[in-house]
Amino acid sequence: MSISNRKVVIVGAGHVGSHVGYALISQSLADEIVYIDSDRAKAVAQALDLTDATNYLPVRTKVTAGDYSDAADAQIMIIAAGPLPSGNQTRMDTLGQTIEILKEVTASIKKSGFDGIIVNISNPADVITHYIQHALNWAPERIFSTSTTLDSARLRRAIAQEIGIDQKSITAYALGEHGESQMVAWSAVTIAGKPLSQWREEYPDTFGKLDLDALA
């Protein structure tokens, strides 16, 4: 009986790639992680940092720096490459720079033999994910964007802080594009399974005072 090695390749060893790697090792979601970065020294440093961190975790994960040839037998590739917005820039303002980086990344993916699933975090996340799908000419179900998952988490945290309850009791989602055009489906927000609108009617002095525009 063969045992599958849960191998993940992370493209981009910067701030976001660092957090992705730590999340994977701390939750024992990967047996092996390979960092790929245009700055080889940064990828090596990141791999060493995470390897050191595994000393304090119950499960060991092999973390190395490599290149696209290491993606051939990986199941998941996480793309976290690209510039961060600076000054008054929005995520969309970085689109041109990110596309130039992703041209090289997608060309390397084609040559690598990688045949798994791609999760894209590079911003503007949804637009870049669409670009990757077309650049690779892959079925869309093989390429995912993190999209508004972070925004949804922030929304639940903000509601929880305002009314003083555990955010795990809240179901709320930011919808649309991870950027300036996203929106909140307030009619679908529930707390402990009860619609927020009902809470606001029953408890006007607490839930009723929530500033939905500010929270969104």
Where are these regions (language model features)?
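Conserved NAD(P)H cofactor-binding loop of Rossmann-fold oxidoreductase domains
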Residues: 81-83
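Beta1/beta-strand and adjacent pyrophosphate-binding region of the FAD-binding site
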Residues: 6-10
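Conserved N-terminal Rossmann-fold NAD(P) cofactor-binding segment
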Residues: 32, 36-75
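Glycine-rich Rossmann-fold phosphate-binding loop(s) that bind the pyrophosphate
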Residues: 13-14
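Rossmann-like NAD(P)(H) cofactor-binding subdomain of soluble oxidoreductases
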Residues: 91-156
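Conserved S-adenosyl-L-methionine
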Residues: 26-32, 137-139
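C-terminal substrate-binding/catalytic lobe of Rossmann-fold NAD(P)-dependent dehydrogenases
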Residues: 138-142, 151-216
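N-terminal Rossmann-fold NAD(P) dinucleotide-binding loop
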Residues: 17-18
